[in-house]
C-alpha cells in the first residue's frame, strides 16, 4: 500500500534494528508506515546442529552480520543516516548478548547522525505489528479506533494475554505457568524427530494427519482466568511416543500425533481467548482480538482464534506470517509510535533481558499520553 507524503501521520523515516534472539534484521519505514526496505537473516544454519539457539553464537552472528545489513537496508531505502527521524532498536526482553549488539549499534548510529535513539520493547513491537498500515489504513490506526484490544502474544519465549488500552498502556491478564506455546511445539517436534525448530515442520506434518485420532488433554481449558499450561500436554505426547521404542515412528502415526497435538493447542487457545475477552469486559471491552508472535503464523491456531473472536462479534487481526516471526519492520513501526509521543531513550539506556510490557517505564510521557 503506497501512501502519499501528505498522509504521513508519524515523524519519519525510522530505522529499526532487531537482534533479540536468532534473527538479525533491519528495516526502514517512512512516516506513513510504508516499508521502504527490510532484510531478515535467519541464523538457522548457525544453531541447527545444536538443536536450539546458543546465546554466544547468536551474539557473535549479530555482530558479524548487522553492520553490513544496516548499510544495505539504508542503500535500498535511498537514505542517509542524517535523513532519518530516529533510530529504534530492540532493547529487551531477549538474549542479552544479542540485545547489546543491536542496541549498541543503534546508539552509535544515533550519536553519529545526531538523531534520537528509541529503545524498543520486543513485546510492544509484536503487539503493534498487526496494526501496520497495509492491514488497516493508517488514518484509522492512528485515530485510536482499534483500542482497546486483546493481544494474544504467542511465541517460543512468550505466551500471554494482554489488554492493550493504547500505546504504552498494557495490562497483563494471564500467561503460561510453565512452557511457552512455541517452546511446546518445538519440544513435540523434537519428539517426532523433526529437528529444530520443530514448530513449522510439525504444522506441515499435521496436514497429513487426523486431528481427532488421539485424545490429548486440553490443559487449563474451562479454568477461571486465562492462564496457560503446556507441560502436561507435552508429557502426554512423550508418553504416547514412548510406545514406539524400537525405531522411528511410522509416518502415519507421527502425522496423527502432530495433528492431534496441534488441535489440542488450538482448542486451548480458543478457550483462553474467550476467557480473556470476558475478563477484558470487566475493565475495557476489547474491540478486536490481535494475535502476534511466531506461533501466530500457524494456520490452525489462527483459524481457531478467528472463530473465537467471531463468536464474540469482534474481528481477529494478525500480521502476515512473515511479520509474525521476529523482524525489524515491527521494531521501526513501534519506533514511529514512540517518536510521535516523544518517548525517546537516553544513550545510557541499558538493554534488559527481562522487560514486561506492564513495566512502569513502558508508559508514555504524561504530557503526550493519548
From Swiss-Prot:
Identify the enzyme class. Answer: transferase
Task: Note whether Chloroplast occurs among the keywords.
Answer: no
Known role: Required for the formation of a threonylcarbamoyl group on adenosine at position 37 (t(6)A37) in tRNAs that read codons beginning with adenine. Is involved in the transfer of the threonylcarbamoyl moiety of threonylcarbamoyl-AMP (TC-AMP) to the N6 group of A37, together with TsaE and TsaB. TsaD likely plays a direct catalytic role in this reaction.
Keyword Acyltransferase among record annotations: yes
This chain's protein is named tRNA N6-adenosine threonylcarbamoyltransferase
One GO BP on record is: tRNA threonylcarbamoyladenosine modification
- List UniProt keywords, sorted A-Z: Acyltransferase, Cytoplasm, Iron, Metal-binding, Transferase, tRNA processing
**Alphabetical list of HAMAP family matching this protein:** TsaD (MF_01445)
According to the record, how does the cofactor bind? Binds 1 Fe(2+) ion per subunit.
Which residues are noted in the entry as substrate-binding? 153-157, 186, 199, 298
In terms of PANTHER family, this protein maps to:
TRNA N6-ADENOSINE THREONYLCARBAMOYLTRANSFERASE, TRNA N6-ADENOSINE THREONYLCARBAMOYLTRANSFERASE, MITOCHONDRIAL
Q: Name one GO cellular component term.
A: cytoplasm
Classification of source organism: Bacteria, Pseudomonadati, Pseudomonadota, Alphaproteobacteria, Acetobacterales
Query: Which reactions is this enzyme annotated as catalysing?
Result: L-threonylcarbamoyladenylate + adenosine(37) in tRNA = N(6)-L-threonylcarbamoyladenosine(37) in tRNA + AMP + H(+)
What does the record list as coiled-coil region(s)? none
Q: Where is the protein situated, by its record's location annotation?
A: Cytoplasm
What does this protein need as cofactor?
Fe(2+)
| GN (gene name) | tsaD
The entry's Fe cation-binding residues are: 122, 126, 326
Family membership noted in the UniProt record: Belongs to the KAE1 / TsaD family.
- For this protein, what is the EC number? 2.3.1.234
